[in-house]
Amino acid sequence: MTFDLASRLAARRAEHLYRRRPLLQSPQGPEVTVDGERLLAFSSNDYLGLANHPEVIAALQQGAATWGVGGGASHLVIGHSTPHHRLEEALAEFTGRPRALLFSTGYMANLAAVTALVGQGDTVLEDRLNHASLLDAGLLSGARFSRYLHNDASSLAKRLEKASGNTLVVTDGVFSMDGDLADLPALCAEAKRHGAWVMVDDAHGFGPLGATGGGIAEHFGLGIDEVPVLVGTLGKAFGTAGAFVAGSEELIETLIQFARPYIYTTSQPPAVACATLKSLELLRSEGWRREHLNRLVARFREGAARIGLTLMASPTPIQPVLVGSSERALRLSALLRERGILVGAIRPPTVPAGSARLRITLTAAHTDAQLERLLEALAECWALMPEECDDA
């Protein structure tokens, strides 16, 4: 018996689900070169526009000159350098937690935290729309795994009543494909009533949310008692790479001792930690970036409503435009690209069948004029959709 990979790929193409990697030939920013074409992009998670910031670049360059390039080894061997340690201390202070622990990717941070905290005999309860890394972590943990209805505290409560062993409630802070916020006050209250811990992956919340960019926990005024396990990603609003888990002394020491994705992975380049220290400084000191971004979000939603687009209840830079079928989403994306606008079409299995969408992401680097250009292009392209696609 052989692996029939050709048939799998053919089926993927027939379902309009085949994915291709666009080739970025320029730095991150609103205007990019992709596959040889100059485009205005609304596809990046660089929410605060820090990925190409000259001070962040300079910090990376100086870090490489001082510390070299590679991490060299795992953190527990000889890969934990001074920049890593300083960044962990800065992230702990930023999040209001005693400790923080660096990881190479957000996927690894989520996998590490869940699998180190629960196992056979325990329970992990997750939002149905959680990121794939969280769902994978729950399945791989060996714990009893169940998903509650999206953002539904009563659905969570029913599952908490049946939970056994140590129970971990896991949710995205900002849901990456919908842009809505987890109802953390209600979820945390239910978890506390049942003696469960809450873990929040705030990959898309740090930077845009909170008075100082502290994310969804700061947005709702929740501390370590309500959210014992807080995960953040550095490759989005921070504009660099990697991730972290913040929490108590005991939590971080537990991850160091038991989290296999941490123990058996080479550390990230120290120079990246140097760059992230600078981006964290800018994230906290340049509040105008959040203010400008929030204004762009409000203006986009007003303009989209005038066009008649179907949006989701998102107060964040993630602004999905619901289209329906995968074919329809691809068509709208292609029409925008013909007009020099790059917006990705999100299709199943990333989102449920029948809910394909354009995932528009706004950043602090976008100008008012660029937003107006997007809205004008959307209005023009949307007017063409009923004639060309009637499968909505």
From Swiss-Prot:
Substrate binds at R19, H131, T350. Its EC number is 2.3.1.47. It is an enzyme of class 2 (transferase). The keyword Acyltransferase does not apply. InterPro entries: Aminotrans_II_pyridoxalP_BS, Aminotransferase_I/II_large, AON_synthase_class-II, AONS_Archaea/Proteobacteria, AONS_Proteobacteria, PyrdxlP-dep_Trfase, PyrdxlP-dep_Trfase_major, PyrdxlP-dep_Trfase_small. It catalyses: 6-carboxyhexanoyl-[ACP] + L-alanine + H(+) = (8S)-8-amino-7-oxononanoate + holo-[ACP] + CO2. Disulfide bonds: none annotated. It comes from the Bacteria. The modification N6-(pyridoxal phosphate)lysine is found at K236. Homodimer. HAMAP family: BioF_aminotrans_2. This is 8-amino-7-oxononanoate synthase. The gene is bioF.
